[in-house]
Amino acid sequence: MGLKKACLTVLCLIVFCFGIFYTFDRVNQGERNAVSLLKDKLFNEEGEPVNLIFCYTILQMKVAERIMAQHPGERFYVVLMSENRNEKYDYYFNQIKDKAERAYFFHLPYGLNKSFNFIPTMAELKVKSMLLPKVKRIYLASLEKVSIAAFLSTYPDAEIKTFDDGTGNLIQSSSYLGDEFSVNGTIKRNFARMMIGDWSIAKTRNASDEHYTIFKGLKNIMDDGRRKMTYLPLFDASELKAGDETGGTVRILLGSPDKEMKEISEKAAKNFNIQYVAPHPRQTYGLSGVTTLNSPYVIEDYILREIKKNPHTRYEIYTFFSGAALTMKDFPNVHVYALKPASLPEDYWLKPVYALFTQSGIPILTFDDKD
């Protein structure tokens, strides 16, 4: 045990020294360094405990912002970890940063599981976790992320609250129902175990005493009787009234982060006379034959703004498997359709998603995706 502590101490010192490099690191918003955390540890240790919220996507940041609004006066530290960095991520990170006491953006362009990234990043996260003041609650959506376990294992007595990460919380094959973290390579697995001890996905799931869901009336994988389920409406369209739809029709295809969807998306756009594509926040490719909607807003926020400006326009939203279909289906003047390529086999992995759309009253439109 003495040797393990000594090794961890040396590791902490090394990572802390390298943390100085991030003091003026614009890529990480200048707050990935450990200086601010060290100040808290030294001077605010006896203050009010903090709440940690971990986010990996823009949707998760939206949920986190709503959770924070329910606890005015409490201290919140937000940690965003993402392989992506673009206008949308910056916009929503700055939104939540303004409402949190501290916010940290870990931009990991090559992903955490890359060999050269994993060990230094996990060590850095462990050091940062130990520099935090007292932690009261930890909120997270991505139960399968071993990076969060670096914090969970440091504060095993903190309350754990979970929240939705899109349709993954509505499908029984979700990775959130797994038991152990997926870490490739013996060296990385052993290092992860040193950083997180015996923490696991199952331990996180079982420790959660409350789950926030953004989907009303749909069976959630976290709704197993072990915890309180709290509905958290994410997008408020209550003040908008349905118009007579005499102002024309706007058809929008929701993009996908998967590059292999490019060709099939272009065929769908042509088949259904779709004029616009709303790129997925993690999408890096464009589509020909349609106009790209360049906006810092996610599609739900964008559409709500458009409805206010054009209350008599009919909006048709087309998607392959985006969870935004479920969050927008009840917006006034909005009609959502799920696209199903005819070439998909019956046992394709999207089958549960289409079943979910059907259950929610979203029409499934099959089209010929072959020339």
UniProtKB/Swiss-Prot annotation:
InterPro entries: Glyco_transf_52 (IPR012477). The active site is at 258 (proton acceptor), 280 (proton donor). Keywords: Cell outer membrane, Glycosyltransferase, Lipopolysaccharide biosynthesis, Membrane, Transferase. One of its GO terms (cellular component) is cell outer membrane. Gene3D superfamilies: 3.30.370.20. One of its GO terms (biological process) is lipopolysaccharide biosynthetic process. It catalyses: a beta-D-galactosyl-(1->4)-N-acetyl-beta-D-glucosaminyl derivative + CMP-N-acetyl-beta-neuraminate = an N-acetyl-alpha-neuraminyl-(2->3)-beta-D-galactosyl-(1->4)-N-acetyl-beta-D-glucosaminyl derivative + CMP + H(+). GO terms for molecular function: N-acetyllactosaminide alpha-2,3-sialyltransferase activity. The keyword Membrane applies. CMP-N-acetyl-beta-neuraminate binds at residues 255, 278-282, 299-300, 322-323. Pathway: Bacterial outer membrane biogenesis; lipooligosaccharide biosynthesis. Pfam families: Glyco_transf_52. It is found in: Cell outer membrane. It is a peripheral membrane protein. Catalyzes the transfer of sialic acid from the substrate CMP-N-acetylneuraminate to the terminal galactose residue of the lacto-N-neotetraose branch of surface lipooligosaccharide (LOS), forming an alpha-2,3-sialyl linkage. Thus, functions in the sialylation of LOS, which plays a role in the evasion of the host immune response by protecting N.meningitidis from complement-mediated serum killing and from phagocytic killing by neutrophils. Homodimer. This is N-acetyllactosaminide alpha-2,3-sialyltransferase. The gene is lst.
